[in-house]
């Protein structure tokens, strides 16, 4: 006779399909997002609930993520990987502004499924009572812009005056588009994409 594994708090019945240990990190992220959508708030997610949903010990979550903020960082890393992912064969034939647009749209499209939760993550990182998050966020933003330049294959050499100007401009662009995207309710993020195209048009 086969015995079902005991459920914890009735949550395990709704766990995402399980895989091997190698994909537990990804399942932790996915389950955290799912719980945030159910609760209506990222800050309401508790890692012990994530462990219950995945039917793993809470200590196993700690093996992969030090806290919920680290889970958020892993979610944003998916956007970064999409940004630097495969490009069309003719990518280098495009103007620089178009390459930048393709890369940024890839980032936003990847995170769009959980846009509201993503916005909550970002607001949490900016919370005035959490100054220990500020410096890492600044460095993460800088890293994102560096990878944007890499992904768009901008030719200016790192450390040159031109590269520095590009970084300042791309940082301002990214933040302005991000603020709009966080509250964009349009289908396919069309409002965000139109705004991005308008902002990039002067570069043509």
Show where each model-derived region lies.
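Amphipathic alpha-helical packing segments from all-alpha helical-bundle domains
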Residues: 130-156, 164-176, 194
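Short, hydrophobic secondary-structure boundary micro-motifs
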Residues: 44, 119-123, 160
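C-terminal peripheral helix-coil segments that are non-catalytic and often amphipathic
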Residues: 1-11, 150, 179, 183-204
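N-terminal positioning helix adjacent to the helix-turn-helix/winged-helix DNA-binding module
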Residues: 20, 24-31
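Short, basic, alpha-helical segments at the C-terminal edge of helix-turn-helix-like DNA-binding modules
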Residues: 76-84
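Helix-turn-helix
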Residues: 2, 27, 35-74
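Amphipathic alpha-helical interaction segments
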Residues: 49, 102, 106, 120, ...
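Hydrophobic alpha-helical connector segments
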Residues: 74, 88-120, 127, 138-140
């Amino acid at each position: 006779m086969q015995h079902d594994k005991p459920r914890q708090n009735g949550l395990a019945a709704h766990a995402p399909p399980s895989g091997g240990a190698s994909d537990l990190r990804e399942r932790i992220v996915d389950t955290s997002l799912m719980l945030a959508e159910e609760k209506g708030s990222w800050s309401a997610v508790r890692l012990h609930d994530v462990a219950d949903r995945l039917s793993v010990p809470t200590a196993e979550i700690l093996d992969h993520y030090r806290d919920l903020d680290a889970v958020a960082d892993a979610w944003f890393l998916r956007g970064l990987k999409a940004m630097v992912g495969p490009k069309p064969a003719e990518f280098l034939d495009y103007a620089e502004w178009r390459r930048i647009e393709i890369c940024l749209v890839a980032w936003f499209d990847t995170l769009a499924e959980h846009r509201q939760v993503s916005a909550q993550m970002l607001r949490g990182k900016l919370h005035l009572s959490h100054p220990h998050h500020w410096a890492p966020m600044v460095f993460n933003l800088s890293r994102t812009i560096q990878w944007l330049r890499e992904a768009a294959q901008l030719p200016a050499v790192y450390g040159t005056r031109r590269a520095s100007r590009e970084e300042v401009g791309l940082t301002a662009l990214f933040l302005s588009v991000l603020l709009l995207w966080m509250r964009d309710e349009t289908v396919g993020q069309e409002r965000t994409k139109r705004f991005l195209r308008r902002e990039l048009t002067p570069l043509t």
